[in-house]
Amino acid sequence: MMSKLGVLLTICMLLFPLTALPLDGDQPADRPAERMQDDFISEQHPLFNPIKRCCDWPCTIGCVPCCK
């Protein structure tokens, strides 16, 4: 019974390696310096509304967050 579990575990590890799982290291929350830089760039954007703290429509030209 234990050898069958070992074989099954080995097959599963070969088919689904742990490196294939997405890691959360590439999330924006893990890169605060880049987030701050992105916010700074948005605040200088001509469509940025400083009162609402978002970009007026249309905001398809690199200005986030979008006012809706």
UniProtKB/Swiss-Prot annotation:
First and last residue of the signal peptide: 1-20
Pfam families reported in the protein's UniProt record: Conotoxin
Family, similarity comment: Belongs to the conotoxin M superfamily.
Free-text domain note: The cysteine framework is III (CC-C-C-CC). Classified in the M-2 branch, since 2 residues stand between the fourth and the fifth cysteine residues.
Residues where 4-hydroxyproline is found: 65
GO molecular function annotations of the record: ion channel inhibitor activity; toxin activity
Keyword entries, A-Z: Cleavage on pair of basic residues, Disulfide bond, Hydroxylation, Neurotoxin, Secreted, Signal, Toxin
Keyword Signal among record annotations: yes
Naturally occurring in which organism (per UniProt): Conus arenatus
Disulfide pairings: 54-67, 55-63, 59-66
InterPro entries: Conotoxin (IPR004214)
Subcellular location: Secreted
One GO CC term, this protein: extracellular region
Name recorded for this polypeptide: Conotoxin ArMMSK-01
Coiled coil: none
Propeptide intervals in chain numbering: 21-51
Tissue spec: Expressed by the venom duct.
Principal location listed in the UniProt entry: secreted
